[in-house]
Amino acid sequence: MPNIKSAIKRVKIARERTLKNASARSALRTTLKRFEAALASADVDNARAALAKAVRALDKAAAKGLIHKNTASRKKSRITKRFNKAVV
């Protein structure tokens, strides 16, 4: 356990950020799972809306540094490909 005031604060902030990042990562995974579920249900309008939400969530996560921008780009590419394959 740190004794210096600034070190105590850093530990506290690290805990808070860990919780926030875990929550955001979980929300991102949930959004992607909702897209997969919408795609599986064969409801095109619902899947299109879910795709838009998933792409937006990936972009936001990359902008905030939650995931790497290349990871976001790769995931967007893959889900868009799956959507186009299912719709066409």
Swiss-Prot record:
GO terms for molecular function: small ribosomal subunit rRNA binding; structural constituent of ribosome. Pfam families: Ribosomal_S20p. Coiled coil: none annotated. It comes from the Bacteria. Keywords: Ribonucleoprotein, Ribosomal protein, RNA-binding, rRNA-binding. Binds directly to 16S ribosomal RNA. This is Small ribosomal subunit protein bS20.
